[in-house]
Amino acid sequence: MPDQFTEALNAPSGRLAEILLKKLTRTDDGGEMSEEMQARFEKLIRAEGEFGDLARVRLAADVPFLFDRAPRWTTENILSLFDWSSPDARAAWSSRKYSTSIGSPELMSLVKEPFLQLFGRSDMEENDIETFADWLAAMMLANQSGETDYPINATEARASLR
């Protein structure tokens, strides 16, 4: 049975999201995306029904890319999808496992609590939990090597996996 991310890849809204992501470039001045791009992304994420659901799922998978290009906009418009009080949270986290990047320590600090909470949720698929456990291990190794400073310490990691 395909998951929502797979559905999004083949749906018009998911394809539209992918096109917008490909057009999203880093600005020369380090600022946010243009107003025109913001309007397009916002129209897509605010769409109702399955069209909007699949668009949000598709964008959730690329949240590290979005955050890198437009941190303020992503924080204001996308990160709330990952909060467990959102009806989109399970689908957002499930699609997030397909991301090619864990994301920056800054991004992880903004989704730290729901990230740690997902390990105790009964509505998450086992293979999703395994993927995120791998991410947790990678963050701990990166912290230990001094490469970076993810906002999750060993005690929090251990407690979330119990």
How would you name each of these model-derived features?
Residues M1-R162:
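Non-catalytic all-alpha helical scaffold/repeat segments
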